[in-house]
Amino acid sequence: MFDLEYQLKNLPDKPGVYLMKNNLGEIIYVGKAKILKNRVRQYFQKSQKHSEKVKAMVKNIEEFEYIITDSEIEALILECNLIKKYRPKYNILLKDDKHYPFIKVTLAEDFPRVISTRKVTKDGSKYFGPYVDGSSVKDIIELIKKTFPIRTCKKNIVEGAKAIRPCLNYQIGLCKAPCAQYIKKSEYREIIDDVIKLLSGKHLDIVENFKLNMEKAAGNLEFEKAAMLRDKINIIEKIGEKQKIILNNFDNEDYISLYSDGKDTCFQVFFLRNGKIVGREHFIIEDTFDTNSSTLISNFLKEFYGGTAYIPKTIYVPNIEDEVLLEQWLTLKKESKSTIKIPIKGEKKNILDLVEKNAKTTLENFKLKYLQEKALYDNVLKDLKNILRLQEEPIRIEAFDISNIQGFDSVGSMVVFEKGRAKPSDYRRFKINTVKGADDYKSMKEILTRRFQHGLSEIKSIQDRKLEFSSGKFSVFPDLILMDGGKGQINIALEVLNTFNINIPVCGMVKDNKHRTRGLIYNGEEIIINKYGSVMKFITRVQDEVHRFAISYHRSLRGKNSFHSLLDDIPNIGEKRKKDLLFNFKSIDNIKKATYEELLSISSMDKKSAESILEFFK
């Protein structure tokens, strides 16, 4: 048994990391300390300085562990790693550990490419970003490919190497074919220099040059060439408009601020690269209560930069805790100097104020939307209770569906809605184990049996250990079950529930002959719900979601198991090469007819794999 008083007395006088646990043994908080003895004891001392969140956490602490480190910076690194590993309830956690996309120009290559990446390394390449919107990176790269004749293949092309036959991109004017040695390295680099200028925001120079060439072409009556240059000018201007210059310096900087309303906090991040805003992002952290802003920002920085691929040269914040220590940690991660600054006045302070205003607006809009949705969902659940004559509003709803094609790879899905909102963390997928062929009823019986068997086992385990009730994977039962089907599916569900002596109302979601949600079946009767507009929309959403979830799982299994072709029998041809070959050649017959050079034009192919194909079809 854990003796709290004894453990507190024997805490070491050293730096380290502490892990707080609840009565289930779950890690609910991870922290670091310069002196473990002082920091951990503070939690258990009565103090008005404790925030509401800390007080709530302390009530749930059953025991703690600690790990001694050689220094405070080592403790900080370990803390970040453990938070990422355990995702403790009372730490600041960002919902998505984002690695933002960058545009990478591979300058270490003789003939560089322009690609998207989420990993920044010291490899001689030039990186532009991060971009918050991944689709904008894709759009920009596609626009660059249309404007500048640069290669898109992954071949290792070196100036002076043996020439190979160029691909289709050369034929249609999208590439200068360095693979065929049709362009010198120096000439190709001039094109890449223009790409870098464009990505650096210096697009006006390129536009001016293109305009001169366009006018010259028009003067020579080369109207087709002039029109092509005009289109390229429009594309370049479109890329240039995506980024607005707001500073005259050219540093890479992040501006981070926050706004708290007493309960929740919104963090806002502005990414400035080369004096331009390239993106912004916000994160809403609930239940921060009266935690001071310097602590919040310190914790946010650890979580945010612990999971990002890129750390800027300078980070501006309104205030912060552990500034020197965090700078050391950021510099270690970046492998070059990174500085945290608190601007007092001037344009940097003005930008930070703007970031805070955006955080305030974002939080207010989030709350407004939340309240509007809550009112809507409250009414939906109230109407659903009345329509079905339930004793209570169905706070937790679980829906089930089966998916298969001609009896292969049958799968089941369970989606969960709580208080009217989808709860993806509780979604579950089931691969059918006991049923052969296409039998939806037996398949449904299997997944429902597994779902409630697991739930009862979890509940028994919690009761046997005399623990507080805690939601496991299946231990929280629904207030209402929705089946994607009619009376047959309902009867299967009721049969399973009766087996376990569980009493939960079960409805069937039925569709019309156009496959649209028509109504509900409950207690053997069909209930028309189209006069309840919001209920109809909600049931349609649930039905679509459970179907989508089942289909997505089925497709993933089908993709792994059901496709076999002649290519699977060829040595040195794996999944990646098989997909690339079929994508480019469209059929096995075309692959059979392909020449050695045509096979090598596929980015994932090498000499050995091309020779294997030629040998196989010989």
Swiss-Prot record:
Q: Which residues form the UVR domain?
A: 204-239
Metal-binding: is it a keyword of this entry? no
Boundaries of each GIY-YIG domain copy? 13-92
Entry's CDD domains? GIY-YIG_UvrC_Cho
Q: Where in the cell is it found?
A: Cytoplasm
GO annotation terms (biological process): nucleotide-excision repair; SOS response
Q: Which PROSITE patterns does the entry link to?
A: GIY_YIG, UVR, UVRC
Q: Which domain of life is it from?
A: Bacteria
* Keywords, in A-Z order: Cytoplasm, DNA damage, DNA excision, DNA repair, Excision nuclease, SOS response
GO CC entries:
cytoplasm; excinuclease repair complex
Q: Has keyword DNA repair?
A: yes
Q: Which GO terms describe its molecular function?
A: DNA binding; excinuclease ABC activity
Which Pfam families does the annotation name?
A: GIY-YIG (PF01541), HHH_2 (PF12826), UvrC_RNaseH (PF22920), UvrC_RNaseH_dom (PF08459)
Assembly and binders: Interacts with UvrB in an incision complex.
Main function: The UvrABC repair system catalyzes the recognition and processing of DNA lesions. UvrC both incises the 5' and 3' sides of the lesion. The N-terminal half is responsible for the 3' incision and the C-terminal half is responsible for the 5' incision.
Q: Which family does it belong to?
A: Belongs to the UvrC family.
Instruction: State the protein's name.
Output: UvrABC system protein C
Organism lineage reads as: Bacteria, Bacillati, Bacillota, Clostridia, Eubacteriales
